[in-house]
Design a protein with these regions (language model features):
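Central helical "cap/lid" subdomain
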Residues: 2-43, 174, 442, 459-460
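Buried hydrophobic packing segments
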Residues: 12, 159-167, 304, 449
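Acidic/polar loop patches that form or flank catalytic/metal-binding clefts of enzymes
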Residues: 23-27, 43-45, 110-116, 170-178, ...
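Short Gly/Pro-enriched turn/cap motifs at secondary-structure boundaries
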Residues: 23-27, 44-48, 54, 114, ...
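Mid-domain catalytic core of redox enzymes
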Residues: 33-74, 91-94, 105
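C-terminal catalytic lobe of FAD-dependent flavoproteins
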Residues: 51, 60, 82-83, 87-223
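Glycine/proline-enriched, intrinsically flexible loops and inter-domain linkers
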Residues: 174, 178-517
């Protein structure tokens, strides 16, 4: 077969592992019960009680009752034999009793009618309650469609159409960025991770989906070199792509802990102060979570020129903002590329896009090109705000005046004994620089920076403020504002493309979109 779709249900992880693919898929015990017949139960709609995590539906004149418990029991594959087919696990009455009692509170008739069937079987779930769909980064033309999270029947029709179009046309007929199998980084596919995280995710199915909700299990797997230092300074961390990032900083004796609400949450006043500090003076945020790739060799320019819609053939020391497009002109990646010298580049992308961008880079590699994922080798500090130059000039001999250190340029400089790559860029629309620091030197450089910033009240800034600052400026974020279904013209980014620079992927589609306006 030219193309293969893996639809192996809870066996998909084991099947995929045989060919070197790790899927964050894990089975848990999943219960339902069926009552005795109810004469009055005909043509009733499905009902869900989200407060209790229970669903009710008619089943041939009887009522089927299922639930998604917060204390789900994981089910390792050792419990599921090779000939396991429509089989069952023993029923733990003590485990399910609270759910049965809750169901009877909603429908007292259940207690009067009685239970005819108790069922307990394995069902597969994912680490974030979203499907695993699409082409795998490891093997060309190998697709997966699994991780239905007990929603397989509801999703079947739509998924069938999406995959039929995908196989025939080469791309999906709907926007499925959230469910892209490439969203999970390597640390999110280990056995220890899925055994810890997925039972919690199952219990979140019917829970209130609070803004900025953070899971509790399988945390602190990838950390910035500054993690402990920032924790001591009040950081409240959130996890994206398996990486712990400081989202906001507690002050004035407050606890660095989320209190969830659909109104302004408890961190709003702290975040607002961070936002204003960047606009009015200077702030520093740890963006070490960003993906960082080194591309080198005599073919490195050809590789990046083929992928990028912007012109990457710039002088060493220039930094280019660009997109990587698909053949339809859709935006597959939104990133920056710094040219260090004639044959070496840094590619900087977001943590949530790390795996898909790394895959896209290596699948389009030209001869005589070497790539390295250096994401964990370098920490990154972004110093932003009108006073950023004053602070940074204290700790480096580099001349930071406009005429000497222009926007969109970078160079290697020293801060103390540490050589760092320093580039003048801003994702928040202020004067600022990004400092790429060897991980081993990160704490020392950070403390030096803080001392230099005392005069200007240098403020620790979290990712919540970074997001609102970039929104205020109108900067795009891949996966939220733009994705593979959007072209440059629709996104207001047509000025980035330089079609005269070379035959980049998506060039013809871009020119057609530009002509249409």
């Amino acid at each position: 077969a030219k193309k293969i779709i893996l639809t192996g249900g809870l066996w998909s992880r084991e099947i995929a592992k045989k060919i070197g693919i790790d899927l964050p898929l894990y089975a848990c015990e999943h219960y339902y019960v069926v009552t005795e017949a109810m004469a009055e139960l005909t043509q009733r709609p499905v009902m869900r009680d989200f407060d209790k995590g229970i669903y009710f539906k008619e089943d041939a004149g009887k009522m089927l009752i299922g639930w998604f418990e917060t204390n789900a029991v994981g089910c390792p594959m050792s419990r599921i034999t090779k000939d396991f087919s429509f089989d069952e696990f023993p029923v733990d009455m003590e485990h399910i009793e609270p759910h049965l009692v809750a169901a009877m509170e909603t429908f007292p008739v259940i207690g009067e009618t009685g239970i005819r069937t108790f069922f307990n079987g394995p069902e597969s779930f994912t680490n974030d309650n979203l499907h695993l769909l699409g082409p795998t980064p490891e093997i060309d033309n190998f697709y997966v469609a699994c991780g239905m999270n007990s929603k397989g029947i509801a999703a079947a029709g739509g998924l069938g159409k999406i995959f039929a179009d995908w196989i025939v046309d080469g791309y999906p007929s709907g926007e499925i960025t959230e469910t892209d199998v490439r969203r999970n980084n390597s640390v999110q596919t280990t056995q220890s991770y899925i055994e810890a995280r997925i039972p919690e995710a199952l219990g979140h199915t019917y829970a209130m989906h609070w803004p900025f909700y953070q899971y509790h299990t399988a945390r602190n797997l990838w950390q910035s070199p500054l993690h402990d230092t920032l924790l001591e300074q009040g950081a409240c961390f959130g996890e994206v792509g398996g990486f712990e990032r400081p989202n906001w900083f507690a002050r004035d004796g407050a606890e660095a802990k989320y209190e969830y609400s659909y109104n302004r949450q408890n961190w709003f006043k702290f975040y607002a102060a961070e936002h204003l500090a960047v606009r009015q003076s200077v702030g520093v945020y740890d963006i070490s979570s960003f993906g960082k790739f080194e591309v080198s060799g005599t073919g490195s320019l050809a590789t990046l020129q083929r992928l990028s819609c912007a012109d990457i053939d710039v002088e060493p020391g220039k930094v280019v903002y660009t997109q990587w497009l698909n053949n339809r002109g859709g935006i597959e990646a939104d990133l920056t590329i710094a040219r260090l010298d004639d044959k070496r580049f840094y590619v900087i992308t977001g943590i949530a896009s790390l795996k898909r961008d790394w895959s896209r880079l290596n699948k389009n590699i030209q001869p005589d090109t070497q790539t390295r994922d250096i994401s964990m080798e370098l920490a990154c500090l972004s110093v932003q705000g009108p006073n950023s130059r004053h602070v940074l000039q204290k700790i480096t001999d580099a001349d930071l005046k406009n005429i000497e250190f222009k926007f969109g340029t970078g160079r290697f400089v020293y801060i103390g004994d540490s050589q760092i790559w320093m580039q003048r860029l801003s994702y928040v629309g202020e004067l600022g620089w990004e400092l790429f620091v060897p991980a081993s030197d990160a704490v020392t450089v950070f403390k030096t920076l803080q001392q230099a910033g005392e005069e200007y009240k240098l403020c620790n800034v979290g990712l919540h403020a970074l997001n609102s600052l970039r929104l205020e400026k109108g900067f795009r974020h891949w996966g939220h504002d733009i994705a593979a279904e959007d072209n440059l013209v629709q996104a207001g980014l047509g000025f980035i493309a330089k079609p005269d620079a070379g035959d980049f992927i998506g060039r013809e589609a871009f020119l057609m979109a530009k002509a249409k306006g």
